């Protein structure tokens, strides 16, 4: 895996690594490197590494915090922007500026649990079924409108109750490395 490669080079690099680029394609740090390839290790201090970290915070941590606090909400998109990230959601409850501290505290609580984040590949049909069962209509729209031919990357936190569909994330195996 990219993590193993970084670890072989040095423990400092392994700690700073967030993803890899294999033959020009960004991949999760714990993905296998299947063949002889040109591999770059993406670190947290790079622009690409910062974007991956922000995307993980929005797609996994912020989204889960929002679902914990507003369980009947529907998640739309959670992109990164120049100086951070945000998440579009639909909820019947009002969210005020005062709620931001509560949301941030919930994010810190989620981070402290050190949940594992794993990637699973699912067909379009399977992904639609998963998001239908989670009552996530916007995720279903995103998947339906996607023109990709390959399977979708779905990211699960350890209890498999929270799923994000996305691109490269920080992945945390169950052993916490």
Regions found by a protein language model. Name each.
Residues 1-2, 27:
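Metal-dependent phosphohydrolase cores
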Residues 6, 59, 87:
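Divalent metal-coordination and catalytic microenvironments
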Residues 31-34, 38-51, 65, 74-80, ...:
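Auxiliary tRNA-acceptor-end handling modules of aminoacyl-tRNA synthetases
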Residues 169, 174-177:
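Single conserved hydrophobic/aromatic residue that forms the stacking wall/gate
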Residues 9, 51-67:
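Active/ligand-binding-proximal structured segments within catalytic/core domains
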